[in-house]
Amino acid sequence: MKKVHERFLEYVKVDTKSDETTRVTPSTKGQLELGKMLAEELKEIGVDEVRISEEGYVYACLKSNCNKDIPKIGFISHMDTAPDMSGKNVNPKIVENYDGKDIELGNGYTLSPSFSPELPMYKGQTLITTDGTTLLGADDKAGIAEIVTAIEYLINHPEIKHGDIKIGFTPDEEIGEGADHFDVEGFGADFAYTLDGGRIGELEYENFNAASAKVEIIGKNVHPGSAKGKMINSILVAHEFVSMLPLDEVPEKTEGYEGFSFLLDIQGEVEKTSLSFIIRDFDKEGFKNRKERFNEIAKELNKKYGEGTVTVTLKDQYMNMKEMIEPRMHIVETAEKAMKQCGIEPIKNPIRGGTDGARLSFMGLPTPNLFTGGENFHGRYEYISINSMEKAVEVILNIIKIYAEK
């Protein structure tokens, strides 16, 4: 039987960086390559009903081995890695018996406790890091490795009774499209867990309400020598728009349950400037107010510069899954119990982001999020503890056992 980190090291060799510009699903060929590889592996270890959809989703089912009426539990992870940094030619480094000090990644980069204050908690453990030139891909190939390893363990230990275990690997989560083509009905689970969290112990069932905002500003260009009273510089109107938003409610100044508006991109010249924002808030009313503020600012500026100067287009992306999870809190409570059984203290924090599970919960599949063990996702300083990965496998198995014993 393969060890969880051995699987992980195989998966990260496949470049699965997603790309929101391609407008196809999956957005990159590497995700299809990994999906086919996973489907073959699942078949080889004895999993039933393995299939890949046209959109590249991998679905499988390990059939129940007992006659009891046991809930059908799903475990889901995503195959893509973030567009933020290259996932090509990932060259992981193994750091055995970590000494709590700086780790030289190579290529002039150092992973240090001054940058990652949590590092000393991994002293004595075995870590997997990057070589400084790419991200690692623990988000979310660690989750995939943990699920497959847990499933193989069940197959090799038929004395462990379980109901139907549903497996799902999705493309394009990192560009917000992971649930777009997910076949909830065909998946057939009563509820599920994503393995897409970070530090050991993380258990999440709250996430941001999320929207995007596109702001387009139309100016008027006139020769600067005779522009007085005529020119409208769309770049300066854009600056005015941004200054009318709460200046302290931005990602770099917020934490916990605090929401924000985040200016992602600005493209402009005198006659036209475009702004791209994301809007985030945990509270439904606060989320509504943030979106309304964008329209109010547009209204004020149109009154000042002329109707049609500023146009705002808002699009909801995903909602806080808390309202869909709370009526079935046994899903969260069982995960807590499963962690405590293997000596892990659950860390229940809100997700300052989203997961496939957030959207799946509103599609009828309640899906909280479990840790994978990774740290510093999406960049060259990403790393993961093998010990944490092994504990994630234990948690999956404990969840399955708890439901089988009820």
Swiss-Prot record:
Keyword annotations of the record: Aminopeptidase, Cytoplasm, Hydrolase, Metal-binding, Metalloprotease, Protease, Zinc
Any Gene Ontology biological process: peptide catabolic process
Main location: cytoplasm
EC number, UniProt record: 3.4.11.4
Amino acids binding Zn(2+) 2: 139, 174, 378
Cofactor binding summary note: Binds 2 Zn(2+) ions per subunit.
UniProt entry tagged with the keyword Metal-binding: yes
Recorded GO CC terms: cytosol
Binding site for Zn(2+) 1: 78, 139, 196
Localization (cell): Cytoplasm
Pfam family, any one: M20_dimer
Cofactor: Zn(2+)
Catalytic activity: Release of the N-terminal residue from a tripeptide
The keyword Zinc appears for this protein: yes
GO molecular function, one term: tripeptide aminopeptidase activity
InterPro entries cross-referenced by the UniProt entry: ArgE/DapE_CS (IPR001261), Bact_exopeptidase_dim_dom (IPR036264), Peptidase_M20 (IPR002933), Peptidase_M20_dimer (IPR011650), Peptidase_M20B (IPR010161)
Location of the active site: 80, 173
Its biological purpose: Cleaves the N-terminal amino acid of tripeptides.
PANTHER family: PEPTIDASE T
Entry-linked NCBIfam families: peptidase-T (TIGR01882), PRK05469.1 (NF003976), PRK13381.1 (NF009920)
Family assignment from sequence similarity: Belongs to the peptidase M20B family.
Name of the protein in its database record: Peptidase T
Lineage: Bacteria, Bacillati, Bacillota, Clostridia, Eubacteriales
Gene behind the chain: pepT
